[in-house]
Amino acid sequence: MCIRDRFEMYSAENAGLVKFDFLGLKTLTVIDKTQKLVNEKDPNFKIDKINYEDQKVYDLLSSGKTVGLFQLESSGMKDALMHMKPNRLEDIIALVALYRPGPMSNIPIYNDCKHGIKEPDYLHPKLEEILKPTYGVIIYQEQVMQIAQALSGFTAGEADILRRAMGKKKRAELEKQKQRFVEGAFKNGISKDIAAGIFLKIEPFAEYG
């Protein structure tokens, strides 16, 4: 059942409703028309069956020739692509997530670790599995939640509360969550100083997450 209302999002959320943002993108129309044009010569072509490991695509992206590509066509993004030289879909996803105020400063770190210039810093051995796909850089809210669970024994529900506290930028709630994080990590044999340092790494999500 779908409920539509005119209340602002926080009031709706407090009432137990979930807010969804639906974007109307011209890009989707372009993709649909492109597939139809291709189908005139190749009836078997389907956009959802394309090869995500096609190296020619990544070579093109790495050259910065991305005019008309949604989220990849700004001059800054072209420059970022040429420095990153992506060779897998995960790189593109990471770059789009990183290319905004705050996390943008982590792009050079991601690139250096990706290309073997420096070793990834996983912050703690328990976090290597979580951060290995992103070369030690915390990029996604899901990673923040997994870190809280792995280090501090948060339940999935508690980790989601931490995520929401960061997303809403509520300082009082964030301080409460920091205390819970540090104490939970200490119970798991991790010093409070190390735990507090790791929390400092994830705290910027309160600014841009």
Predicted regions, residues:
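Mg2+-dependent phosphoryl-transfer active-site scaffold
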Residues: 4-209
